[in-house]
Regions:
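Nucleotidyltransferase catalytic core that binds NTPs
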Residues: 1-195
Length: 195
């Protein structure tokens, strides 16, 4: 459906839709840095969509909005020291995944590396976490989810099979090897000059 520039715009849009359809559509939320997006992220998002599309649980009129909250570049830089892909690119790619309704950024504030404030404002009915999270009570957002009546669903998309940090490290190692190979091919590896 849409990429929103912030949570406020999303909430305004949701309220407007509620006025038109006569009820407040529930939100099924998932979140992450998705930097870079990998198959584990994809499976978590696809499984979240599959849950939302379950006709036994949600008749088509009551299907929740599949909403993906994406951590901003500053959040990633503060947490892991870098961002690999821009927020805009990550949001657009996620928006292209079939069944995703809304994509919104989460902006880093006050050394808080959680999305608890976002959950407090959005008040989703469900919050899904990927395969590396198996104990709902052991996530930082557990308490706020309990306060707002949000069910936490863990292990979504299967077991953890990739790490964004690992992918970036592999890309860095590949680039270094390419530079070393180029230097060797130019004769720098034979003691002519250093590079």
């Amino acid at each position: 459906m849409a990429i929103f520039e912030n949570i406020e715009k999303f909430l305004e849009w949701r309220d407007l839709c509620s006025d038109v359809i006569g009820y407040h559509q529930a939100v099924m939320l998932t979140s992450g840095g998705f930097d870079p997006l990998h198959v584990g992220h994809l499976r978590c998002i696809q499984e979240t969509v599959k849950m939302a599309n379950n006709p036994k649980k949600f008749p088509s009129a009551n299907r929740p909005l599949v909403t993906v909250l994406v951590n901003c570049d500053d959040f990633l830089k503060a947490k892991k020291g870098y961002n690999f892909m821009s927020l805009e690119d990550r949001m657009e790619i996620i928006h292209g995944i079939a069944g995703v309704d809304c994509v919104l950024p989460w902006f880093y504030t006050n050394d808080d590396f959680t999305v608890t404030k976002a959950i407090h404002r959005i008040r989703p009915r469900w919050f899904t976490k990927g395969g590396d999270r198996t104990d709902a009570t052991n996530i930082p957002e557990w308490e706020i989810c309990q306060q707002v009546g949000c069910e936490v669903i863990t292990g979504v998309g299967g077991k953890k099979i990739r790490s964004s940090s690992e992918l970036v490290e592999n890309a860095d190692r590949f680039n270094l090897e390419a530079v070393e190979l180029a230097g060797w091919a130019a004769g720098y590896g034979e003691g002519k000059d250093s590079y």
